[in-house]
């Protein structure tokens, strides 16, 4: 039996790992968050205008945000790339042999790219977005998954509410490249005929015939669900997420606390109170929220003094969330960037090299913070109008989820003090309005410096530090 290897601590993530010949061994899992022992293929099912692409995009965004490398493969886009000009619904008629041939080629091309992503490029989850309305087509895709060692999970969206279908056609399909420069009524008529092309051959997932498959059926945008044979942790998280999202129009308001006493001094973390300008912002925020006349607004804060002081000025009930507390800077709490450079120059450089994954000694990383904030995202997806009064790093993580920003971009998103971001979910994304409330505040945003080498001179390490007292 081999003797246990010596351990060393990874300087970036502060994770203990074996080492040999004076160098750390490769970590057991190098592909982001390992939640499954094999890749997962998510297969969308449903007629056109049932929200499949909406679900695909949201699911892809969520999984990437929690650290699971995920990519969406929209077969409609493959078809548009192959057939540059869309003429009419006749392309989708079941007896259109040329159309059938092209659509099959597009599906196969998408599956080849799925295989490349999951088997060669280190992907964990692929979302195959197409109608997949026949049992024969789904069997072909399932066999493809089995042959390549993937777990297959079907997501079917069923909608019989005419109002929801009509709204989906107007919001999404008429903005499709297929209908650019087409009359609205003409486009609607054509799209309705396109749906008819699929209806006669549509075979929904069946509790008896498909009892061996893993799937979730979503009825009328979340009115009810059927879940069958959830196979692993990643599938259970997918189900949990899909059971929390809704399409009710709403807005989410994100802002930081008012300027704090430590903000003025350029010190990070701590639990300070508001500065005079911070208290002024809290009053302005109260007026802004009152002027917006938001129906059934919920207000959330962290459990830190500065967010609670900000919320108190609103004069409305609010809920404190410990998970909304600012990132824990560990041994660097309440230090200025200059003091961190003086006392921990190696740590300061390592953080600049990979700000998302870097973990403060005895503290947290942005990666840790994202995992901590997942319950907040789930609850935000369930709620309607919410104001979240939080902190710079926390706001960056929440904003990255809604705007689909990569991990490398997340720690550098600009979230200035005394500014409210109004996020309004739209068809395939999120509309953002930035509202500055006309109360001056210090700048706390530090860009990544050009020189991130551990041997850099102090002046190059500190070149992007914002001015402070």
Curated annotation (Swiss-Prot):
GO terms for biological process: fructose 2,6-bisphosphate metabolic process; fructose metabolic process. The active site is at residues 129, 159, 257, 326. Residues 1-249 are annotated as: 6-phosphofructo-2-kinase. The most important regulatory mechanism of these opposing activities is by phosphorylation and dephosphorylation of the enzyme. Its EC number is 2.7.1.105, 3.1.3.46. The keyword Kinase applies. It comes from the Eukaryota. One of its GO terms (molecular function) is ATP binding. The record marks 391 as: Transition state stabilizer. ATP binds at residues 46-54, 168-173, 348-351, 392-396, 428. SUPFAM superfamilies: P-loop containing nucleoside triphosphate hydrolases (SSF52540), Phosphoglycerate mutase-like (SSF53254). GO terms for cellular component: cytosol. Beta-D-fructose 6-phosphate binds at residues 79, 103, 131, 137, 173, 194, 198. It catalyses: beta-D-fructose 2,6-bisphosphate + H2O = beta-D-fructose 6-phosphate + phosphate; beta-D-fructose 6-phosphate + ATP = beta-D-fructose 2,6-bisphosphate + ADP + H(+). Keywords: ATP-binding, Hydrolase, Kinase, Multifunctional enzyme, Nucleotide-binding, Phosphoprotein, Transferase. Residues 250-469 are annotated as: Fructose-2,6-bisphosphatase. The modification Phosphothreonine is found at residue 444. SMART domains: PGAM. Beta-D-fructose 2,6-bisphosphate binds at residues 256, 263, 269, 306, 337, 351, 355, 366, 392, 396. In the C-terminal section; belongs to the phosphoglycerate mutase family. Synthesis and degradation of fructose 2,6-bisphosphate. Homodimer. This is 6-phosphofructo-2-kinase/fructose-2,6-bisphosphatase 4. The gene is PFKFB4.
């Amino acid at each position: 039996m081999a003797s246990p290897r010596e351990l060393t601590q990874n300087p970036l993530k502060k994770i203990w790992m074996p080492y040999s010949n004076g160098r750390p061994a490769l970590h057991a899992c190098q592909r982001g968050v390992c939640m499954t022992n094999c890749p997962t293929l998510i297969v969308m099912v449903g007629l056109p205008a049932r929200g499949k692409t909406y679900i695909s995009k949201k699911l892809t965004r969520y999984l990437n945000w929690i650290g699971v490398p995920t990519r969406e493969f929209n077969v409609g886009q493959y078809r548009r790339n192959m057939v540059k000009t869309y003429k009419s619904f006749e392309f989708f008629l079941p007896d259109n042999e040329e159309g059938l041939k092209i659509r099959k080629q597009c599906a196969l091309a998408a599956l080849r790219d799925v295989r490349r992503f999951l088997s060669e490029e280190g992907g964990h989850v692929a979302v195959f977005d197409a109608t997949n309305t026949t049992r024969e087509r789904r069997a072909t895709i399932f066999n493809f998954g089995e042959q390549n060692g993937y777990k297959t999970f079907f997501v079917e969206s069923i909608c019989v509410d005419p109002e929801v279908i009509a709204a989906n056609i107007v919001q999404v399909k008429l903005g499709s490249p297929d209908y650019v420069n087409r009359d609205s009524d003409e486009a609607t008529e054509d799209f309705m005929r396109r749906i008819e092309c699929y209806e006669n051959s549509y075979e929904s997932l069946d509790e008896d015939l498909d009892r061996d498959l893993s799937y979730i059926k979503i009825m009328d945008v979340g009115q009810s669900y059927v879940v069958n044979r959830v196979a692993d942790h990643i599938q259970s998280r997918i189900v949990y997420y899909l059971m929390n999202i809704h399409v009710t129009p709403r807005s989410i308001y994100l802002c930081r606390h008012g300027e704090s006493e430590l903000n003025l001094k350029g010190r990070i973390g701590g639990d300070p109170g508001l500065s005079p300008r911070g208290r002024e912002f809290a009053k302005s925020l109260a007026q802004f929220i009152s002027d917006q006349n938001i129906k059934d607004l919920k207000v959330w804060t962290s459990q830190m003094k500065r967010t609670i002081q900000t919320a108190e000025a609103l004069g409305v009930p609010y809920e404190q969330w410990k998970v909304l507390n600012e990132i824990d800077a560990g041994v660097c709490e309440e230090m200025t960037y200059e003091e961190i450079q003086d006392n921990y120059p190696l740590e300061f450089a390592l953080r600049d090299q990979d700000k998302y994954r870097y973990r403060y000694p005895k503290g947290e990383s942005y990666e840790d913070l994202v995992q901590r904030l997942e319950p907040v995202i789930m609850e935000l997806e369930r709620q309607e109008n919410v104001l979240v009064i939080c902190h710079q790093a926390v706001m960056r993580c929440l904003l990255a989820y809604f705007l689909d920003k990569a991990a490398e971009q997340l720690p550098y998103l600009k979230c200035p003090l005394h500014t409210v971001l109004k996020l309004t979910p739209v068809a395939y994304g999120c509309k953002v309005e930035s509202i500055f409330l006309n109360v001056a505040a210090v700048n706390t945003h530090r860009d990544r410096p050009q020189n991130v080498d551990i041997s850099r001179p102090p002046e190059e390490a500190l070149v992007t530090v914002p001015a402070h007292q």
